[in-house]
Amino acid sequence: MAAREQAALESRHREAADGGDPGAASQLGALLLRRGELEDAEPYLRAAAAAGQRAAANNLGVLLHQRGHRAEAAQWWRQAAVAGSAPAAHALGLQLRDQGEEEAAEYWLHFAAEQGHPLGAYALGDLMEHRRDVRAERWFRAAADAGHREAAYRLARMREAAGDKETAETWYRTAAARSHARAALRLGVLLEERGDHDEAARWYRQSAQNGEARAACALGFLLRDAGEQSAAAEWWQEAAEAGDGNAANALGALYAGRGEAAEAEQWYRVAMEAGDQNGAFNLGLLCAGLGREAQAEQWYRRAAYAGHREACNALAVVLLQRGDESGAEPWFSKAAESGSVDGAFNLGVLHAGRGEQQQAHEWYARAAAEGHGEAALQLAVAQEQRGQLSAALDRYRQAAAGGSAEGAFRLASLLDRRGDADAEAEHWYAVAADAGHRRAQVRMGVRAAERGALEIAESWYRRAAEAGSRSAAFNLGLLLARQDSETEAVLWYTRAADAGHGRAALRLALLSLRRGEPVQAESWCQRATEYGPAEVAERASRLLGALSAELSA
């Protein structure tokens, strides 16, 4: 309505109201109330309300409530509500709820809701949900159907909590389409969980543009996973500057991964200042990586005292490494009791080191139940030592599935010894070998050689030998010797012998003899005698005796 028309309408209302028209007084009072002219509005509203105008009684209640006259406001709202005003019933219900009079509040909110008042239906649903009343969903639905976006969001949350994601998605879409930022965020989460990343990104972006920092953070992670690190950093920075600690931590981790420690530290501090104790913990990790151990301990301690369970574990590790076992144990306990899987495992290690096997077993079992591969490995080793082979196999499988290369190797070895699951044994040897387990690499080499796959065998032996396995170096030497590559074979025999491999030393002694180098042969014999095992030492000793006699003749 144009300003001139508005002024003319107000003039007509004022003239009629001053002439005693209660309807005009009600409309004029409402107009003045909307403009914030409370002093001018009040007499018109009072006159109209006294004449039985229920809209005026409701608006008079609003005016008095704004001025802090809550008791008188309630009186006028009650009068209007009794006369059938749904807005007044809603307002009265809210005030009664805030005063703790929930039974009376429910009555008036129900009155408003039954008349189709969406705010009344929403407030009634809110009251019922607070009391865990299942009828809350009905009233949220009524409000949502009438266009109330917060009700649609709350209804979606209820359906999601009940496991009905399909209905939840429908209501999230309804609320998000009305620019509800949190609904757009939750819709994005649901879509991301089922792999619809493009649509999830659209809703995250809409939510972020409507001021939801968590959506900007989530969008950053989605972009990072798609390889768009620069775009991810922009959204994380926007979220971090809006106070999202998770985004600040992500930004810190991004810079830390690039080796930009100063920038990483800056954002970790922003996270900490936002109340996210991951910031303090990450500062500890950053300082530890830079060799600033004292500072690392301070940050771990700060995060640990704030209840960060992994910081408790990290602090305990620092204390244990410097010999303070009594100081470490309470922090391991706090970490474990708070749900840190590593804390539970480390507490098990601590008890095992003292010979307290029962306590160690309990903590290993707790960590293993949460998927800790090394904890499952410790349990499996103990079971195998007790002869509980079936149970040990199950635990080794759990350890291997949890990422333990040693668990995978031991599982394969046990299956190998049983001889009834060769394919599975091969699989787990391969898993361990691919993870860099040297003995598994040697076994893969041996198995390949046994089936005549010499190139594959050589590849596995080389990987293990180059990683420091003396058995692999010896086996590689044998393989090369059979392929007439004696010069390289000698290099690997020497590497194995220098690492204490008796058979390699004996092989070098025999090669030295064949070359007419008795002094060198004697030296290798002495080392083979020293290194063993027994049968090698015995052969080397006999050869050494013959060499000594020859050299002294």
Language model features: what each stretch is:
Residues 36, 68, 100, 131-132, ...:
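Residue-level detector of the short coil/turn that links helix A to helix B
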Residues 19-21, 51-53, 83-85, 115-117, ...:
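Short helix-capping/linker turns of helical repeat alpha-solenoids
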Residues 114, 369, 498, 513-535:
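TPR/TPR-like (Sel1-like) alpha-helical repeat modules
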